Amino acid sequence: MFLTEAEILDTPLSLNYTCQYFEKNKKNLEQFFQENQQKKFTILGCGSSYMLAKSTASLFASLLGTSANAIAAGDYIVDPLFWYETVKGSIVLLLSRSGKTSEMVWALKHIKEAHGCPAVSITTEDGNDLMPLCDLNLTLNWCHDDSVCQTRTVTNLYASTLLLAAEYARDDRLRESVLAAMRESTSFQLKYRPVLAEIANLDWDNVVVLADGPICGIAEEGALAFTEISMLTGRYFHLLDYRHGPIVVSGKRTLTLALLRPGEEKLQSAMMKDVIQRGGPVVTISHC
C-alpha cells in the first residue's frame, strides 16, 4: 500500500481524534472568544492551507455580523502595507501542516508587531515555530501527513475550521454536521472505493473540479491533489463561471468532478448538460 493511500484510509480514525480534541478544548475556545470579541478574521495559509483558508474565509464571512479574508502568507510578506487595513482589528487564524513555513512565521511576526492581533494556529506538529507567537494553539499531531501531497491533514484541518466556526457562532447544527460526517466516513470510503476504481479506469488525462461557496477551497485542493499525486493537470473553477471561457479546453479526455449545492437544480443542471456535451466523463457529488 502506498503511503498516501494509507494516510487517506486513516482519515476516519484521525477525524474521530480531532472531534474529541475540540470537545476537550471547548472551554479554552469559549474563553478565547470571550476575551477576543472581534467580528473580523484574517486567515493565513500557504499552498494547500491557503486553499483551505479560502474555504474558511467564505464560511466565517457567512456568519452574522462577521467579515473574513484569506491571504496567502507569501502575498502578505511581499507587500504588508497593502494588507494593513484588511488585517487591522482582526483575529488571525493560521493553518499549517508543520507550523514552520517561513512565510507564515514572518507574516505572523509582522502582524503582531504592526497590529497586535490575537492569533490562533491549527497545525499538526507540536513545538512548531508558530506556537510561541499565538494566543491559542490547536495541535493535531495524529493527522500529520508524511506524503508530499496532503490528504488526511487537509481533511482534518478543514474539519477543524468548521468546528472552530461552530464554537465562534455557537452553532450546534454545524458542529453536529461535522460529527455526523466523521461517524459516516468509514462507511463512505467502503461504499465508494469500488466506484472510484471504475472512474480511475476510464480514459482521461486531465481533471477539472467545479464547486462554489464554502467548499471552494477544498475543491481547489482536490484539483491540486490530481496534479501532485497523479501528475496530471488538475484545475478548479466556480461551477457556473466555468461556462465563461475555461470550458473551451474541456474535451473527451477531461474528467469533470462537480460538487453540487443543495436547494438549486435549474442552473446547476443546465451547467452540467453543457459539460456533458464536451464528451468527457462527468462525476457529480451532492448531498441527498
Each model region followed by its residue ranges:
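Acidic/glycine-enriched edge-of-secondary-structure segments
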Residues: 9-19, 61-70, 176-185, 223-234
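Accessory alpha-helical/coil subdomains and C-terminal extensions
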Residues: 182-202, 208, 225, 230
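Flexible, glycine/charged-enriched surface loops at secondary-structure junctions
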Residues: 5, 173-179, 197-199, 236-237
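Short gly/ser/thr-rich secondary-structure transition/capping motifs
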Residues: 23-27, 71-77, 189-192, 237-241
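An N-terminal, well-structured beta->alpha segment
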Residues: 1-39, 183-190
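Acidic catalytic cores of enzymes that act on phosphate-bearing nucleotides/polynucleotides
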Residues: 203-267, 278-280
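Glycine-rich phosphate-binding loops that contact phosphosugars or nucleotide phosphates
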Residues: 25, 34-183, 212, 247, ...
